[in-house]
UniProtKB/Swiss-Prot annotation:
The lineage of its organism: Bacteria, Pseudomonadati, Thermodesulfobacteriota, Desulfuromonadia, Geobacterales. Keywords: ATP synthesis, Cell inner membrane, Cell membrane, CF(1), Hydrogen ion transport, Ion transport, Membrane, Transport. It comes from the Bacteria. InterPro entries: ATP_synth_OSCP/delta_N_sf (IPR026015), ATPase_OSCP/dsu (IPR000711). It holds the Pfam family OSCP. GO terms for cellular component: plasma membrane; proton-transporting ATP synthase complex. This is ATP synthase subunit delta. It is found in: Cell inner membrane. It comes from Geotalea uraniireducens (strain Rf4).
Length: 180
């Protein structure tokens, strides 16, 4: 089974529990918080992945971290399950998948808008409004500037890319000219 499939399975299970308890956003925050602590501490990550440390020692370390972060009982049990099943290494992918499932559940989409030049706030709002109408969801737009685009914009929503950049248009023209 692929890493993404495993991560999605665990994330979906936790989202379902979160939905039942009305705690989807809280679980997302706690999972992200724990993932950030783990990512920031390479020594901690190596302890959890090192077979030289026994499962009991790993459980004690995990309990201590859970206590310091004051995580909810459901997230604590979830993290203990990941540890017991040797799936803690998948936590970054699980956290990302959880965020995606939580967004779907709450009707949120997080597209990325990349432009060749900085956009004015009114332009960004106009694009955001258009995306809201197109997707039918609340839009949390991430705006980036990439001077290599020369001009225009590239919008990425999930795995769909809408490329209206000058760079791409020039590449298409060049391709047509080369083919003669």
């Amino acid at each position: 089974m692929s890493t993404n499939a495993i991560a999605r399975r665990y994330a979906k299970a936790l989202v379902q529990i979160g939905a039942e308890e009305g705690q989807v956003d809280k679980f997302n925050s706690e999972l992200t918080q724990f993932n950030t602590v783990l990512a920031a501490n390479a020594g901690l990550t190596s302890v959890f992945s090192n077979p030289a440390y026994g499962i009991e020692a790993k459980r004690e370390i995990l309990k201590e971290i859970i206590g310091k972060l004051a995580l909810s009982e459901s997230v604590a049990k979830f993290l203990q399950l990941l540890l017991d099943r040797s799936r803690l290494a998948f936590l970054p992918q699980i956290t990302e998948s959880y965020g995606n499932f939580a967004d779907d559940l709450s009707g949120v989409v997080r597209p990325t808008l990349t432009s060749g030049l900085p956009l004015e706030e009114s332009q960004i709002e106009e694009i955001k409004t258009s995306l809201t109408k197109t997707t039918g969801k609340k839009v949390m737009l991430k705006v980036q500037v990439d001077p290599s685009l020369i001009g225009g914009v590239v919008t990425k929503i999930g795995d769909k890319v809408f490329d209206g950049s000058v760079k791409t248009q020039l590449a298409k023209i060049q391709d047509i000219l080369q083919k003669g």
